[in-house]
Regions:
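Conserved class I S-adenosyl-L-methionine
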Residues: 2, 8-66, 80-84, 102-105, 162-191, ...
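Class I SAM-dependent methyltransferase SAM/SAH-binding core
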Residues: 72-74, 78-123
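Conserved Class I S-adenosyl-L-methionine
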Residues: 78, 212-254
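A short acidic, Gly/Pro-enriched loop at the edge of an enzyme's catalytic core
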Residues: 122-134
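A short SAM/SAH-binding and catalytic strip from SAM-dependent methyltransferases
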Residues: 133-146
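A short glycine-rich, Lys/Arg-flanked "PGG" loop and its adjoining helix->strand segment in the class I
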Residues: 147-159
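Short alpha-helix
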Residues: 192-214
């Protein structure tokens, strides 16, 4: 679902789309994952978000042909990736998320009505072995038990299925980057952690997935206008110096 979009610029100043200038002290309210995404849902798709833009730019070329395939978008939020996969020719698909507000926002999109359902990532309402392709974007940082997540993904995917995960890169997290948003002129931060590539790989390997590849893209020129439009152009060269997103491609070996 998800989209980390808060970038650290010091102990109190953060990039959050249209937040206060970096020189100003920003008061950030901390909210639970469920409450946070319910608040964010109304503006999630229209808020400029450099990490979502980077993730989409980096992940799209990695996805296989989905013509005639069955796809799942787990932690789908507003159905951002499910809509793309269905438009690319997937035979059938479904999106699951725990945020009812995010799902309502997704249902307003053309082509997604009837494809979205409320569910926990660790207890998906899908039968055994239904998916040729599964994507789970910007959600791992909200999940403590990656081994249970990988087992559940193994349950719902077919032999040889492809699984793609994306999340905030651990180096960004170490620099203070967090998941945040603006709501009614206030800044909010959602609790998140960052799993290393080794941790993610170990969890998925335990359920029979092989790591096909991992990439660690950095913010680059295509994302610069988002910073400039938000009045944060002076931050861009600093944040582009480290990997921003961790993208993993796994394949079921059974």
């Amino acid at each position: 679902m998800r989209g980390a979009r808060t970038v650290e610029t010091g102990s109190t100043s953060r990039f959050q789309g249209q937040s206060a200038p970096p020189s100003a002290s920003v008061t950030v309210g901390r909210v639970s994952v469920t409450h946070g995404y319910d608040l964010w849902a109304a503006t999630y798709d229209r808020d400029p978000n450099p990490l979502l833009a980077l993730e989409e730019r980096a992940l799209q070329p990695l996805l296989p042909d989905v013509q005639g395939k069955q796809v799942l978008d787990v932690a789908c939020g507003t159905g951002r990736w499910l809509a793309r996969l269905l438009a690319a020719g997937a035979r059938s698909g479904a999106g699951a998320d725990f945020s009812s507000a995010m799902l309502r926002a997704g249902l307003s999109k053309a082509g997604l009505r009837g494809y979205l359902t409320g569910a926990d990532c660790l207890a998906l309402p899908f039968q055994f072995g239904v998916a040729d392709l599964l994507v789970c974007c910007f959600a791992l940082g909200h999940i403590g038990d990656l081994f249970s997540l990988a087992r559940e993904f193994g349950r719902v995917t077919k032999p040889g299925a492809d699984v793609f995960t994306t999340d905030l890169h651990p180096q960004g997290y170490a620099r203070g980057w967090r998941t945040g948003f603006r709501y009614r002129s206030e800044s909010f931060e959602i609790g998140v952690s960052a799993h290393s590539l080794r941790e993610v790989h170990k969890a998925f390997a335990s359920s029979g997935f092989e790591l096909v590849r991992s990439i660690e893209p950095r913010l680059d020129e295509p994302e610069r206008p988002i910073f400039e439009q938000a009045g944060r152009g002076n931050l861009f060269n600093r944040v582009r110096a480290i990997p921003a997103v961790l993208i993993c491609h796994f394949r079921a070996t059974w």
